[in-house]
């Protein structure tokens, strides 16, 4: 067992006079990154150093900026203190590795894209960052830095992909970001998809202009004014290139590259009905179509990246579903890197050594130092884009969730590996899907219900390693992407729910609610169509050039199904077309109870009934895909007859993604947004950020594990995060009102830890909870001397006395299940040989904690239990304790 004493201190909790709510007392309650890293996540931008072959940066779609100084073996997050985590572009100053530029907001605008707030710059290798402007651009595609003048930089901004915006185009600075000029502007609906600068003559710059706008049910990629633009004065002015071999008609996304060894050679990936890859050998004066091979660019709006070998103008790479290579100037291509995760978004080639490359893809990154013959990658980036999280009732409890691009994964909340929560404990219930929901059966956590995109539902039995396909309705119509003629429609994120009153009943959402009571063998609808069923919104997505029919834009479907714990038969439903529906009789009758003022095309991601109060439910709507980026959240206390908006105090442009009422404190509510978690102690009347030590990231789901009282978050960019033992959070208002308080410790387990080494799995280890019993107390002001926390056994005898922290606010120490240590051997000079720091490990049973705070003594009882898998009896544990206690008495007598 680990013998440790770990302390952390929370800040002072103050009362908000208007609401009686605890406002800032939870600022130092810490979140714990739980992983996993085994699946990686989408990397949108990569950059390396020409001078230092071990230095790399990468930007994640929703997971911030990461830096490696050892050739990719270890990565550290360097952007976690900033206000956003979505990254579109990363660039290292060619003249100074310490200067790094970051453009925020991913520019691959699929349905789960996250926004940014402009351009950041670091001059100390990522230690600190300064936002240098362009805050309203939202999605940045590329940053170019002049190798001859580091004060000269050009930024390509795609701009708001959900609405027309004046902040689209190319922006130029000549003073290192102090001031900016918008120099390429073709209208509010078109931005810049890519930029390329001539290495030898940096005044020559090419830009791809792209019209793109997304709606919840479709998107438009391409417009009349799109096309290729060129500047010969460093981006001050631009000229559109037309004719001379370039495609006619509407064009869409464009990817660009200039051959460093022959700057007259320019490559352009152009979304067009007339081809895919064009090449110019004369500085863009004339062009030729060199490839119409879809291997080069299979989904233009999502990929469209091209790169050229610095030493060979005919050696070309393209990033698409596969990484492709040409050695004949783009005429023919072959797929490479077959052992690397697919869906490639970024390529960087060392300018002085074309054998060294790094690529970014949907599973993270991959590196080569031999021109792509072999690739290395480590499962050490916890940047998973989870949609939902499901929690088991086992011990340690199982955590499951579905990830964009990377299946569903399940793992332990608390690893029994002393090294931490490594990738070794995580497993994929079903492979080969974009994961969405994954929930352990409440009766047996070894049975996992999970689904992939478009309603592909599976049941996985971990013990026997069997899986069953259990989708209620399978139709070739939906498989052929013509959902308008299908009787049932399933969302990219089709919801799964268990009835709280009978976990044998499982619900699955299409456009109706399906139910099964026999483990998914048979299903029946328990509702009519609960959506708007707007046929105009059920047509194939994409266009006008390329259709994109993956199912990500399927609409008029159900997003959430939740049953009320306090009322049998009460089921709440949220849809992706702006409805909240309710039944109070198990589905026999339904009522539309949508909050007034809801966006008719918004997504009700969560409708969460209170686990404590009848008739109370919270709803959150995300309407960003309609161009409405404001927060939307409501509460009802009368079954939806009346709703109250609860967005007071939230930033006006903060997308709302999830909501969850607390399971102990009826006034406490948690709100997940695009940039972190918020909490309210007055049912949503006022909000305070609960981000604390967590990076800015999209919070897609919020759950509470009731046995351990842990708050668990599904983030869309940084995997799973946990706040352990949230009773101090739940009872913060009472503590502040009392002036001092000892919170009741939770039941804790003497887990038997092991040291596990599993090859690549040791590349990543998330922190386990501190080993032992967390003991938390609140004091309004510090005392003259630090409080002593005394651990008592069931008879009232002292087991151990611990010196606590002495700060105003919440303080926490962890008792590690051990009795007082023996007296140190002071006759030995070397402290390592003076005796152990801990006494014998105690026997599971009843204990209490006692502490005096500002003249008052508090006692709270708690239980210590054995490892659930332990075979040793309590009598055997007692004998072991007696032996070690006797040895400690002998140790204590050595100096006497």
Model-based region annotation:
Residues 1-4:
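Positively charged n-region of N-terminal signal peptides that target proteins for export
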Residues 6-17:
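Bacterial N-terminal signal peptides
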Residues 21-763, 770-772, 782:
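Beta-propeller blade termini and top-face loops
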Residues 733-896:
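Extracytoplasmic/secretory ectodomains and luminal regions
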